[in-house]
Swiss-Prot record:
Physiological role: RuBisCO catalyzes two reactions: the carboxylation of D-ribulose 1,5-bisphosphate, the primary event in carbon dioxide fixation, as well as the oxidative fragmentation of the pentose substrate in the photorespiration process. Both reactions occur simultaneously and in competition at the same active site.
Gene name, Swiss-Prot/TrEMBL: rbcL
Protein name (record): Ribulose bisphosphate carboxylase large chain
Pfam families registered for this protein in UniProt: RuBisCO_large, RuBisCO_large_N
Catalytic activity, as annotated: 2 (2R)-3-phosphoglycerate + 2 H(+) = D-ribulose 1,5-bisphosphate + CO2 + H2O; D-ribulose 1,5-bisphosphate + O2 = 2-phosphoglycolate + (2R)-3-phosphoglycerate + 2 H(+)
Textual note on the cofactor: Binds 1 Mg(2+) ion per subunit.
Primary localization: plastid
Residues annotated as transmembrane: none
Organism: Viburnum acerifolium (Mapleleaf viburnum)
Description of how the protein assembles with itself and partners: Heterohexadecamer of 8 large chains and 8 small chains; disulfide-linked. The disulfide link is formed within the large subunit homodimers.
Length: 475
């Protein structure tokens, strides 16, 4: 035996593989206010005890590896390791468990969602001892929240910039999403804004393709915005998509948008990445631009019930990284969204303090302290008949975005925008008068359509349209 080996042995190092639960399962641990807390839905492989599976998640997402290493003795594992401190079975599921893990704050770089996710939702999701793993929720401690700028401006500052109060904001995604020339695209933007919408939107697929380069689109959309503003006397905006293949190109587009004097730009935060998104959010605050966020790719991550990551975690991450709007499900329409769960992460986006409420999928109390709120965006298969439900469910602090529900109007874009604006104003007035939109909504829309031919035509076109499928996102 060499002297070196003897030294290691005498120091107490013992090579080999040992159960994770001996080090990382600590049911007696009392969580600290500074810990990041995670709730994982764990599906262990057959024969793997839930305690070992939960401990493996804590280990592999913090300081652990598959075997004992002598360098463990050069640091304080008790200070830096993640701890699985509680496990509970999932009701109605035979082999699924919720494992609660606490992470010391020192494991994470300040102000970096990228670093936080690299640890918590990194290699551990491919771990062989687990059949599946889903991150259901995170508790971000105040000490970590305060290292983030968050949304560039937030809900109240946006309303002040736009001078729009007391109602949801109205938007529309320009269709067809691909193939229009820049000039025809700008024309569609102008007609929608002139008709009464607050915003129009680049589809997330629109970046800078051969049929419409980004600079041409920005110029024609800016022209449409200024023309519509002059005619209506209202502040208008178009979500100019700054998403690009490189961060440098993304910033070039944001700078050009600022030079044009438009109020808002857009970013695909999951396909673009959190580092790019946080960079853009910082620029937007410094330069007075609002930032609209699209969540393209989210369903790849969040749609399966037993593996991946719930959207409430992605919503929290966006609030930390930065965005003034984000698409967040409709409850009605064509896209996924179960009511109580959706309202849970809507509160996580908008409110300063959100209590734990398992009936809405909220596993931890979350305190955002001074981090600004994010406006949730409703889009996907919605039309004028949905307006009462959307107004009643989501209240004033939301953006209602009707793509086909505007551009599909039989008389064209501007009448489609008029129909949506009239329907919204009628619903807001009825609500303010104390009427029950859940019960009287259709009557409110019918009454308004008697003096708005544009709304009457829209009501006729979409009276039979429904999207009736069972929601996959259930508790």
């Amino acid at each position: 035996m060499s002297p070196q080996t003897e030294t290691k042995a005498s120091a107490g190092f013992k090579a080999g593989v040992k159960d994770y639960k001996l080090t990382y399962y600590t049911p007696e641990y009392e969580t600290k206010d500074t810990d990041i807390l995670a709730a994982f839905r764990v599906t262990p492989q057959p024969g793997v005890p839930p305690e070992e599976a939960g401990a493996a998640v804590a280990a592999e997402s913090s300081t652990g590896t598959w075997t004992t290493v002598w360098t463990d003795g050069l640091t304080s594992l008790d200070r830096y390791k993640g701890r699985c401190y509680h496990i509970e079975p999932v009701a109605g599921e035979e082999s699924q468990f919720i494992a609660y893990v606490a992470y010391p704050l020192d494991l994470f770089e300040e102000g970096s969602v990228t670093n936080m996710f690299t640890s918590i939702v990194g290699n551990v999701f491919g771990f062989k001892a687990l059949x599946a793993l889903r991150l259901e929720d995170l508790r971000i401690p105040v000490a970590y929240v305060k290292t983030f700028q968050g949304p560039p401006h937030g809900i109240q500052v946006e309303r002040d910039k736009l001078n729009k109060y007391g109602r949801p904001l109205l938007g529309c995604t320009i269709k067809p999403k691909l193939g229009l020339s820049a000039k025809n695209y700008g024309r569609a933007v102008y007609e929608c804004l002139r008709g009464g919408l607050d915003f129009t939107k680049d589809d997330e697929n629109v970046n800078s393709q051969p049929f419409m380069r980004w600079r041409d689109r920005f110029l024609f959309c800016a022209e449409a915005i200024y023309k519509a503003q002059a005619e209506t006397g209202e502040i208008k905006g178009h979500y100019l998509n700054a998403t690009a293949g490189t961060c440098e190109d993304m910033m070039k587009r944001a700078v050009f948008a600022r030079e044009l004097g438009v109020p808002i730009v857009m970013h695909d935060y999951l396909t673009g990445g959190f580092t790019a998104n946080t960079t853009l959010a910082h620029y937007c605050r410094d330069n007075g631009l609002l930032l609209h966020i699209h969540r393209a790719m989210h369903a790849v991550i969040d749609r399966q019930k037993n593996h991946g990551m719930h959207f409430r975690v992605l919503a929290k991450a966006l609030r930390m990284s930065g965005g003034d709007h984000i698409h967040a499900g409709t409850v009605v329409g064509k896209l996924e969204g179960e009511r109580e769960i959706t309202l849970g992460f809507v509160d996580l986006l908008r409110d300063d303090f959100i209590e734990k409420d398992r009936s809405r999928g909220i596993y931890f109390t979350q305190d955002w302290v001074s981090l600004p709120g994010v406006l949730p965006v409703r889009s996907g298969g919605i039309h004028v008949w949905h307006m009462p439900a959307l107004t009643e469910i989501f209240g004033d602090d939301s953006v209602l975005q009707f793509g086909g529900g505007t551009l599909g109007h039989p008389w064209g874009n501007a009448p489609g925008a008029v129909a949506n604006r009239v329907a919204l104003e009628a619903c807001v007035q009825a609500r303010n008068e104390g009427r029950d939109l859940a019960r009287e909504g259709n009557e409110v829309i019918r009454x308004a359509s008697k003096w708005s031919p544009e709304l009457a035509a829209a009501c006729e076109v979409w009276k039979e349209i429904k999207f009736e499928f069972e929601a996959m996102d259930t508790l």
